[in-house]
From Swiss-Prot:
MF annotations from Gene Ontology: ATP binding; ATP hydrolysis activity; ATP-dependent DNA damage sensor activity; mismatched DNA binding
SMART domains according to UniProt: DNA_mis_repair (SM01340), MutL_C (SM00853)
Species this protein is from: Chlamydia trachomatis serovar L2 (strain ATCC VR-902B / DSM 19102 / 434/Bu)
Family matches, as CDD domains: HATPase_MutL-MLH-PMS-like, MutL_Trans
This protein's UniProt keywords: DNA damage, DNA repair
GO cellular component annotations of the record: mismatch repair complex
Pfam families: DNA_mis_repair (PF01119), HATPase_c_3 (PF13589), MutL_C (PF08676)
Cited function: This protein is involved in the repair of mismatches in DNA. It is required for dam-dependent methyl-directed DNA mismatch repair. May act as a 'molecular matchmaker', a protein that promotes the formation of a stable complex between two or more DNA-binding proteins in an ATP-dependent manner without itself being part of a final effector complex.
Family: Belongs to the DNA mismatch repair MutL/HexB family.
Domain of life (superkingdom): Bacteria
Name recorded for this polypeptide: DNA mismatch repair protein MutL
One biological process term in Gene Ontology: mismatch repair
Signal peptide feature range: none
Length: 576
């Protein structure tokens, strides 16, 4: 029977904790976060995590921290029981992760929990907790430290269960959380066992650079700019991704303030402003930045999960960031200028034109790159693209007009056929061709694929690589053959034509990233979304326009699959 709205009652402790859990515990990753932060605050330097069912079946966190005496366990299960602060003012000088004393009772109120703990020289105890209350406590010897096992998460709050995402999404959230923990906490060893398989292992002796390479890949570290700048009590340390390394979302950005993973639109904006002239619009740089600020400048008590931060003295922080980033980018710019000045000019042949154009090409990559026309590339065995009619109504494609390249005007080309002169928008045209070659079953045409004699490799996070591994057959059906050469990288055996190697690699990483993030989305929709965001016009090879013939074989469409303009006939009215 419902209570009268006019009567005011005190809520029981279980209900209070369950309400609090709704704020603090969003999903299984939230539980892992709170438990490992307890381990870190307890001084642990070895933390072992095990999860089943994406964490909803079981979460076990084992550490070698200071541990607890048996009589401390029931106290730790009460709300606002903490060893971190005594007064509100202490929040602004915190060096610990937790301070509210809400996490453990909140988790215990929506799960079945077991705590096995011992202090140095202590006997050790094991406590069973159900619905937030200890039901059994017995002596249980163990070495110094604590093991907390959480079973059947949300078992007694079915409404919360119905709002949970898939176990795969939970695993993704846990992986990102643990990757951030690996980056933020040097001197700590980490092991994560997911579904009885080791997903992550980092020795405590591994340094910051090794950890960045583990999380973001060795290729990121090799191309990134290292920064380390200090002004008084302020310091910024980390890696800024090369301008060639950018993504369609901010997922590649890792920010830590005083070793706490946080989000800050202010800092993200400052970094983006520094890259504005180097990367395409609506793309985001990759970075790993660690800021060390006076604790009284940071308010982490903004969000229950402490993922947001309010900052004081933004002007000083901005000055430090701008100077550090500018110095790093200027160092790279200077080194590139020196390389360019040392490279002699050479002539690039233009197929079927009989003329040559001087070009300066800096040798800034490990393997020599050349700029011949597409059909002359020595590292590709390219089959001439063929158009296969799937319907008698499309038989008109067999009559193909000749198209002649006239000139390039930056992002557009002028070409000529029997109808007249056309303006072709390079980005939209090449994007459309790539899309046709991927999803031709939807468009009645199919373009042949190119096979790499020396397969390039592409690197990503292990979770993203696992997503691609599950989609290898679907990718092969699209003409992309990948072979896994390490836990976090693939070799590209073959791919659709008319896309440069770096663009192809960028698209594969984007597909893996989007697929890992949006588990419920169809593969075809993921392909379409990521192709739409891909930038084709950047660093296009000079006079490599063999793809124009294919565009004309497709009937010289005026608009791309997403409605973007591909070409327009130049009319007399344009000159009046």
């Amino acid at each position: 029977m419902s209570l009268s709205p006019s009567r005011i009652r005190l809520l029981d402790s279980v209900t209070v904790n369950q309400i609090s859990a709704g704020e603090v515990i969003e999903n299984a990753a939230s539980v892992v976060k709170e438990l490992i932060e307890n381990s870190l605050d307890a001084g642990a330097d070895e933390i072992h995590i095990e999860t089943l069912g994406g964490g909803r079946g079981q979460i076990v966190v084992r550490d070698n921290g200071v541990g607890m005496d048996p009589e401390e366990v029931p106290v730790a299960l009460q709300r606002h029981a903490t060893s971190k602060i005594a007064h509100f003012a202490d929040i602004f000088s915190l060096a610990s992760y937790g301070f509210r004393g809400e996490a453990l009772p909140s988790i215990a109120s929506i799960s079945k929990m077991e705590i096995h703990t011992a202090r140095a020289g202590g006997l050790g105890s094991k406590t069973l907790i159900e619905k937030g209350e200890p039901v059994c406590c017995e002596p249980a010897p163990r070495q110094q430290g604590t093991t907390i096992a959480v079973h059947s998460l949300f078992y007694n709050v079915p409404m919360r269960q119905s709002f949970q995402k898939s176990p795969q999404m939970d695993r993704l959230a846990i992986r990102r959380l643990l990757e951030n923990s690996v980056l933020s906490s040097e001197g700590i060893g980490w092991t994560w066992i997911s579904e009885r398989r080791q997903e992550l292992h980092v020795a405590k002796k591994q340094g910051f650079i090794e950890r960045v390479a583990l999380v973001l890949g060795e290729s990121f570290v090799q191309e990134a700019f290292f920064i380390d700048k200090q002004q008084g009590d302020l310091r910024v340390l980390g890696f800024l991704g090369s301008p060639n390394q950018h993504r369609s979302t901010r997922q590649g950005q890792r920010l830590f303030i005083n070793n706490r993973a946080v989000e800050s639109s202010f800092i993200s904006k400052k970094v983006a402003e520094a890259y504005a002239w180097m990367i395409p619009a609506q793309r985001y740089p990759i970075f790993v930045l660690k800021l060390f600020l006076p604790p009284m400048w940071c308010d982490f008590n903004v969000h229950p999960q402490k993922t947001e931060v309010r900052l004081l003295q933004e002007g000083q922080i901005s000055n430090l960031l701008v100077e550090a980033i500018s110095e790093a980018l200027l160092r790279r710019s200077s080194s590139l200028e020196e390389i360019v000045l040392k490279v002699p000019t050479e002539k690039i042949p233009i197929e079927n034109e009989g003329i040559s154009v001087p070009s300066i090409r800096p040798a800034i990559v490990s393997a020599p790159l050349s700029c011949p026309t597409f059909s002359q590339q020595p590292y590709l065995k390219t089959e001439m693209a063929t158009i296969v009619s799937r319907d008698s109504a499309s038989s008109s494609l067999s009559v193909v007009e000749k198209v002649r390249f006239l000139t390039s005007l930056g992002k557009v080309l002028l070409v000529e056929d029997s109808e007249g002169v056309h303006v072709v928008f390079v980005q939209a045209a090449r994007k459309h061709l790539f899309y046709v070659s991927l999803l031709s079953e939807r468009l009645e045409s199919r373009l042949a694929c190119q096979t790499f004699l020396l397969p390039p490799s592409v690197q990503m996070t292990k979770l993203e690589a696992d997503f691609l591994q599950m989609r290898l057959e679907a990718l092969t059906a699209l003409g992309i053959e990948l072979s896994r050469i390490s836990p976090d990288s693939f070799a590209i055996e073959s791919a659709p034509p008319f896309i440069q190697e770096e663009e192809l690699k960028e698209w594969i990483v984007a597909l893996a990233q989007e697929g890992a993030l949006h588990v419920g989305e169809s593969f075809e929709q993921l392909v379409e979304n990521t192709v739409q965001k891909l930038v084709f016009s950047r660093n296009a090879r000079a006079f490599d326009y063999a793809w124009l013939d294919i565009l004309w074989k497709l009937g010289k469409p005026e608009k791309a699959f997403d409605g973007e303009m591909i070409r327009r006939l130049v009319l007399d009215d344009d000159f009046m």
